[in-house]
From Swiss-Prot:
One of its GO terms (molecular function) is structural constituent of ribosome. Belongs to the bacterial ribosomal protein bL20 family. It comes from Chlorobaculum parvum (strain DSM 263 / NCIMB 8327) (Chlorobium vibrioforme subsp. thiosulfatophilum). This is Large ribosomal subunit protein bL20. One of its GO terms (biological process) is ribosomal large subunit assembly. NCBIfam families: rplT_bact. Keywords: Ribonucleoprotein, Ribosomal protein, RNA-binding, rRNA-binding. Binds directly to 23S ribosomal RNA and is necessary for the in vitro assembly process of the 50S ribosomal subunit. It is not involved in the protein synthesizing functions of that subunit.
Length: 115
């Protein structure tokens, strides 16, 4: 009896892996054994960096709030302390957006937090 192989599934599996490596340079994009390692590593980086992205954006928002707060004569830590003590419900993302897009409104928030 001849050896039977499920070539349809094998080709589909290889094609799926090769499609994930589209745009990779050299053998990383067309040699299956190298592609497997490249795709695995890319997925590891993607998994890790989805978590790092949250930290990166939070630090960006803090930098923007700090810069705008210092233009209004107060440090970031004192501003956030005042906002929490006054129970002003605004998150850092929204506060950073206001600081960049509407400095007058940000100045009003600073004034109301410090008064």
């Amino acid at each position: 009896m001849p050896k039977s192989t499920n070539s349809v599934a094998s080709k589909a599996r290889r094609k799926r892996i090769l499609n994930k490596a589209k745009g990779y340079w050299g053998s990383r994009g067309n040699v299956l054994t190298v592609v497997k390692h490249a795709v695995d590593k890319a997925e590891q980086y993607a998994y890790r960096d989805r978590r790092v992205k949250k930290r990166t954006f939070r630090s960006l928002w803090i930098m923007r709030i700090n810069a705008a707060a210092r233009q209004n004569g107060v440090s970031y830590s004192r501003l956030m302390d005042a906002i929490h003590k006054k129970n002003i419900e605004i998150d850092r993302k929204a506060l950073a957006e206001i600081a960049v897009k509407d400095p007058e409104a940000f100045a009003m928030i600073v004034k109301s937090a410090l008064d």
